[in-house]
């Protein structure tokens, strides 16, 4: 089979390890010593006979495969295996075989695509096939981001015998616990992913005429988005039935139950193979909550070392700036040498100096945002800054959950409300939802802006193009502290306990945490920096596994989980919490009608009331670090 594959020899010598703006020490790895032989489109059989297209990059000496056996770094991707050439250029000269495989039904692979449900079995089959090849020394690691990070965890959940370590970056996992379904709401970036990727890499898109139709659908995604719900057989997506079927099933299924179990790592961490795991994430990544909670779950479930690095990053990017904000030079990290050091330790057995250098001298390394002075950078961004903190664990044991209470008139303070009765009422019109402006979203810039953003409308949001603050909307209820008297560092998970009622049998409540900069010469209107947000659909207020409609007018508690935060709120800044009932298109809009999820025909304006009195003390719980820690 290998002999039949197309052979190519390329020289990738002279690569140098880049010093990192990440700590005080560069990380060592093997020096480049090999050229590369490429074997394209090797068709690797799975246990059911389906063959998956696989590119193999082998260490070479001259025009021949180098003698001996080598550890393997494997990528399994739905995005096209050609994208792994950069990793091959880096790792193969250093004595690794790099393998890139199109997942089932994607790229050049045979079979029918399903959203990750085949990847436990296929990952195990691919790994065991590789382990039996004469150039493999029996040790395999994996790498990749997002969906490609998920295929690593799924292979580990399948307990592939020769899988030695994984390095998932921003892994797309825990779909019933925030990855796709967030508090009962649907993350529309998945809808966008399907609409976009069915036109790129699906089996159907190999037909040029069909590809054109699917691309036209993607080009008009905003119009389709404004006319949800998507109905079976009534859009061009019907020409790719496996994509249409999977998307509709996901959008209809909001309960965190057996349907989502296939990639639920948090609640089934005991199924994960006990191997070294190195997790890489970002505070503005859409999977920030999932990544940090997966770290905590694996630390309890397995004995192998588990390490976590969290930067100020968006999905798949480890740069110093994104959105409207610059985090400073230390935020920019070259991940490849860091991964290389990990592979040297766990695939090659080198232990010299490992654990004495960043980021592996402690289990957790995280970037604390917010040490900057807020000036405007030459490219027009706010300089928020930040610095790296090493920690023995996450969440930080020294972080103290501290309640800040919502008060009448928009105040936010640690004092419990004194009023016997106090509330704020607003109307939520699902035809005019609050727009998404940044935050933990990704991969959908055609419909929403991602990352660290000032909470104003503008051209970056097609549903709110006017350059005015979101706080000017009548359906955004704002609660703000006085200017802080000292720096306040918040690190860890965040939640809002809201007491509320509605005129509808079902509605949403959203919460958003904001670092409010005071007006300055560079930013005369100030700057409202989103730190994270969350949502809870009313029918899932008691359980994420079952629905229970609301009784109109009855007061209920709603516990909203927000994205985690790692930020220093500086002296003179304010901590702000925005409460509303929509965040579109990060989440699908609740029609308030109580109809089945993603099968509604009516939209009803809901009258929603938030309570903030002595008996119904709505609050945000912030993990505060003691001063000087």
Question: Language-model features: where?
Answer:
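Active-site-adjacent alpha-helix of alpha/beta-hydrolase-fold enzymes
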Residues: 289-306, 598, 602
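N-terminal cap/lid segment of alpha/beta-hydrolase-fold proteins
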Residues: 29-68, 480-486, 499-500, 546, ...
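Alpha/beta-hydrolase fold nucleophile elbow
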Residues: 134-147
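Short glycine-enriched nucleophile-adjacent loop
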Residues: 149-160, 498
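C-terminal, loop-rich substrate-recognition/catalytic regions characterized by aromatic stacking residues
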Residues: 215-234, 324-629
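Short beta-strand/loop motif that positions the catalytic acidic residue
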Residues: 279-281
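Cap/lid segment of the alpha/beta-hydrolase catalytic domain
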Residues: 59-131, 179-182, 187-188, 319-327, ...
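Accessory cap/linker subdomain of secreted extracellular hydrolases
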Residues: 93, 157-271, 354
